[in-house]
Design a protein with these regions (language model features):
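Short glycine/proline-enriched loop/turn "hinge" motifs that connect secondary-structure elements
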Residues: 1, 44, 102-106
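Caspase-like cysteine protease fold
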Residues: 143-230, 265-273, 283
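Short amphipathic alpha-helical interaction segments
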Residues: 230-252, 265
Length: 286
């Protein structure tokens, strides 16, 4: 995959002042993307939520979630991401006013938290469960067909992995489109996907196949063969069609497998997702 962001790792941040300074520095400047990730203790009271630091005391637990959000909201960076693996972190993005809780997230801000405002965050084998799933998602588990990993994809990956009775991740955003946080090698080369319009002249058109598409249907292979025999041009197309089937863009028509669709002179067609990518290719968007 692609290299990560320019990363600054800070371990054992001991004071509230130091953590506040690091958050300010993270969202300073005018870069395209700034991402703040915190894994540690969280606290909530009648006033709001906190990222707890070791120097905490009663009524002064650490950096408030409202301060973190205000810093991100006021940042000149184009896209601001806040990812929190701490107890009660789902309170992030809300303020209490006269007994009511209101969401206040400026444009360009995205928040992903390990749990809801009333939940603790589970730890297992030295890792927060949320962080372990986050790492899996960034390693490719949350990648789309093109290999892009977006905040929405990460949330969907983590959401599916956690059961209804476990801690629930929270996703809040105010953006017009998702930014890719990382790119990994896609399951199918982009060149193959871009040829989808070569094989299907229209998104609802089926591609007729015959035995010449199956590479093993050749007199050179010691088994029963059917005319027309394997044709190199068609077998090359068939190979790519099978790859597109593997990522859910193509399905055989009238048969369970692409092999039998070819050998029985059936056809294949685009799935609903395949039609979406057909339109993207047709309109030169990928």
């Amino acid at each position: 995959g692609s290299p990560n962001f320019s990363v600054r790792l800070e371990k054992n941040v001991m004071t509230k002042g130091t953590l506040r300074k690091l958050i300010e520095e993270c969202f300073s400047g005018d870069s395209d993307v700034a991402l703040f990730y915190f894994s540690g203790h969280g606290h909530i009271d009648s006033v709001g939520g906190y990222l707890v630091t070791p120097d905490f005391s009663e009524y002064d637990y650490g950096v408030t979630l409202q301060d973190v959000l205000s810093i991100a909201n006021n940042s000149k960076c184009k896209e601001k991401f806040i990812i929190l693996d701490s107890c009660y972190s789902g309170f992030m993005g809300r303020i209490n006013s006269k007994g009511q809780s209101t969401a206040v997230i400026n444009e360009g801000v995205t928040i992903l938290t390990a749990s809801r405002s009333t939940e603790s965050s589970v730890e297992m084998n030295g890792h927060g469960v949320f962080t372990a799933l986050l790492l899996e998602a960034l390693s490719g588990g949350a990648a789309d067909i093109l290999g892009h990993i977006t905040p929405g994809g990460i949330y969907a990956y983590i959401d599916k992995a956690l059961g209804p009775w476990e801690q629930r991740p929270v996703f809040k955003t105010n953006v017009t489109c998702f930014t890719s946080l990382r790119k990994v090698i896609p399951q199918v080369d982009i060149g193959v996907i871009r040829r989808i319009c070569d094989y299907f002249c229209e998104e609802n058109k089926e591609l007729e196949m015959d035995p010449s598409f199956e590479p093993t249907n050749s007199p050179d292979v010691n088994h029963e063969v059917i005319k027309p025999y394997a044709d190199p041009k068609n077998t090359s197309v068939f190979s790519e069609l099978q790859k597109l089937e593997g990522i859910g863009l193509v399905i055989p028509v009238g048969e369970e497998h692409m092999y039998f669709a070819a050998m029985n002179s059936k056809s294949c067609k685009l799935t609903s997702l395949g039609k979406q990518y057909w339109r993207l290719v047709h309109n030169n968007l990928i």
